[in-house]
């Protein structure tokens, strides 16, 4: 993420602050784009700056063949209308998370044959409302956080992603999957 900037220390938090701080103490920077390299140069960063492309996507394709198709309670992922939902960001806590839950319930009501896979963040601020809302819904598969290969396997087999994750916003389109970003 060298050189990626939103120019708002609070958004995303804490990622933007972390990127800026790390760029000041690092001597080697792997920028994904020329624009990112220019951001580093314009902010007075010293050290070697290499434009390398997106290492997240490199890792995705390096691991694609090893990706597992997780067994979600006997559900065959490729035969379902499957939506992968991932939500965890601070900006979505509280009322925003309740709005997301409301929207997911609308989808489930309208499209009764749709399944949702929802890995739950460990933070109880996110986890508890999801459990309360979906623990008894047979069309929602609540899981613990996925390891990387299971994550890739789930992305490969879903029809759509709904997420506030910056990483998933990059990975899913690289696999030809549509993404609805759950952020302001």
Predicted segments, located by residue:
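A nucleotide-sugar donor-handling region in carbohydrate enzymes
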Residues: 22-96
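Donor-nucleotide binding loops and adjacent catalytic segments primarily
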Residues: 67-157
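A donor-sugar binding/catalytic signature common to diverse glycosyltransferases
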Residues: 29, 151-184
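A short, histidine- and acid-enriched strand-loop-helix "catalytic/donor-clamping" loop
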Residues: 1-13
């Amino acid at each position: 993420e060298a050189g990626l900037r939103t120019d708002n220390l609070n958004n995303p938090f804490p990622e933007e602050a972390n990127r800026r701080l790390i760029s000041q103490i690092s001597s080697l920077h792997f920028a994904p784009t020329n624009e990112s390299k220019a951001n580093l140069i314009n902010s007075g960063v010293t050290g070697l700056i290499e434009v390398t492309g997106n290492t997240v996507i490199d890792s995705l394709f390096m691991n694609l063949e090893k990706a597992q198709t997780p067994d979600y309670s006997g559900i065959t992922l490729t035969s379902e209308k499957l939506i992968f939902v991932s939500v965890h960001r601070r900006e979505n806590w509280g009322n925003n998370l309740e709005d997301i839950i409301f929207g997911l319930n609308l989808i489930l009501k309208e499209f009764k044959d749709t399944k949702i896979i929802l890995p739950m963040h460990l933070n109880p601020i996110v986890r508890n409302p999801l459990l309360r809302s979906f623990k008894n819904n047979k069309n929602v598969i609540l899981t613990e956080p996925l390891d990387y290969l299971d994550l890739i396997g789930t992305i490969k087999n879903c029809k759509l992603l709904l997420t506030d994750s910056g990483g998933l916003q990059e990975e899913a389109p690289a696999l030809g999957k549509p993404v609805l970003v759950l952020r302001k």
